[in-house]
């Protein structure tokens, strides 16, 4: 049976349907409230509270597939993001896959700044720099990355990007 780890599982958007399809799913969620909601939705998911940067509950090479769909755009520093990738790599079996979600800078600029006509406002407010990179403030909920940021993280973690599936 395929073993899946959902890191930053939230309320179970992915882990619950995957468990219902018959996969052996383990979920890890930082926020206690979200974890409670996930547990209410399904008793088929093994759900734990924990941090994406420290997957100490799990052994090396334990999962066939590791999903990291929430943490990477909530983690602020490159060090935290690298720690999360390294931990995902550690718990994923050789030949397994790690799927990671990021919020892409360019997509956000195109949809918010250009399409919704907020370029001038974004620059004046300091949300965009002169190279149209989204700047982050300490209390921002999300962090934005460019493709070169992902490539640098992957290189540091000795991971290879197979493909980008969608922009979000």
Feature annotation, model-predicted:
Residues 2-8, 99-126:
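Conserved class I S-adenosyl-L-methionine
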Residues 13-54:
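Class I SAM-dependent methyltransferase SAM/SAH-binding core
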Residues 56-66:
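A short acidic, Gly/Pro-enriched loop at the edge of an enzyme's catalytic core
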Residues 65-79:
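A short SAM/SAH-binding and catalytic strip from SAM-dependent methyltransferases
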Residues 75, 134-149:
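Acceptor-substrate binding/catalytic loop of class I
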Residues 82-94:
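A short glycine-rich, Lys/Arg-flanked "PGG" loop and its adjoining helix->strand segment in the class I
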Residues 159-168:
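Conserved S-adenosyl-L-methionine
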